[in-house]
């Protein structure tokens, strides 16, 4: 996953390459334990969120659009937001995210 992120986003800060990979694994664990539905485990949504961040959208809003909003249940969305907040600051900007 880290290799894919580096290929798609060569200018992504290496610290955040690792954090996004770990975020995906965290969501995968939540899916495996049936805490959240598999709809939230969407690699394409994460890549799209990174593209939005590159264009200037704050990380929290971009990840909401790309991942969190795929879940319809508000409790499930809360679990997803908590997993995201543990890895990625909501106000993270493109200037800090990309080199």
Each model region followed by its residue ranges:
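C-terminal regulatory/interaction module of P-loop NTP-utilizing enzymes
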Residues: 1-99
């Amino acid at each position: 996953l880290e290799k894919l992120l580096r290929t798609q986003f060569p200018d992504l800060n290496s610290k955040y390459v690792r954090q996004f990979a770990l975020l995906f694994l965290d969501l995968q664990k939540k899916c495996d334990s049936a805490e959240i539905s598999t709809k939230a485990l969407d690699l394409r949504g994460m890549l799209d969120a990174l593209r939005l961040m590159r264009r200037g959208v704050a990380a929290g809003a971009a990840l909401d659009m790309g991942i969190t909003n795929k879940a319809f249940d508000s409790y499930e969305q809360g679990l997803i937001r908590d997993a995201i907040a543990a890895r990625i600051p909501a106000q993270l900007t493109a200037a800090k995210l990309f080199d």
